Amino acid sequence: MDIKYNLAAAYKIMAYLSLDDHTYTHLSARSKNADFYYIYPFGLRFEEVTTENLLKVSLDGKILEGEEYQYNKTGYFIHGNIYKARPDVLAIFHYHTPASTAVSALKCGLLPISQWALHFYDRISYHDYNSLVLDADKQSTKFVNDLKQNYVMLLRNHGAITCGKTIHEAMFYTYHLEQACKTQCLLNSTIQQELIIPSVEICKKTVKDLLSFEEDLGKRDWEAWLRLINM
């Protein structure tokens, strides 16, 4: 399907799942080898995003098509620099919820204590908080370096970045990361008890099984999300 159609749908799905944060987060997508990407106009709520109002932005942050409400320097730096460094990445979701932010602030990070979390066993990166990403050279380089070759990164004291080779793969990672973070927060809110954590052997086997369970990761779920929002 059309990239703009699917990206607009992703915004609506994120809003439906309450994974938006008013106007403060952003999702983007591009075609393979493209030197530009699509992203929403900073200032809209996710429910308001349509194929018609998506912006076309160069990897250097120049608006090529569309009308913006406010120049989102931080957002354009994040998306543009990841796309430059990672030709395999065709979709980037940046979001922050109470659960993802809470887990990002824990020194232990995301623990392998649920099947949701095991999707990311030894496959998640961390980026230390350094205010807004406004220094194109210094901060953006560190951002990309911290992501490494992973598709998911927790931003300490801030939230998360989820990437994908497709929009539906990025959505898949986002949903499972949020469920994993919620579960960990629930456990942290209970009386301190010793946690049952699967062995390293089981964790390694499970992440391999989970990520090879379907040929096109997230596609089945994506089609269900589209039916849910009537798109």
Curated annotation (Swiss-Prot):
UniProt GO cellular component terms: cytoskeleton
Native species: Rickettsia prowazekii (strain Madrid E)
One Pfam short name: Aldolase_II
Cofactor binding note of this UniProt entry: Binds 1 zinc ion per subunit.
Binding residues annotated for Zn(2+), in chain numbering: 94, 96, 158
Record flagged with keyword Metal-binding: yes
Cofactor needs: Zn(2+)
SMART domains: Aldolase_II (SM01007)
Keywords annotated in UniProt: Metal-binding, Zinc
Family under the similarity heading: Belongs to the aldolase class II family.
Keyword Repeat tagged: no
SUPFAM superfamilies, alphabetized: AraD/HMP-PK domain-like
Protein name: Putative aldolase class 2 protein RP493
InterPro entries reported for this sequence: Aldolase-II_Adducin_sf, Aldolase_II/adducin_N, Aldolase_II/adducin_N_sf
One Gene Ontology term of the molecular function aspect: metal ion binding
Source species, domain of life: Bacteria
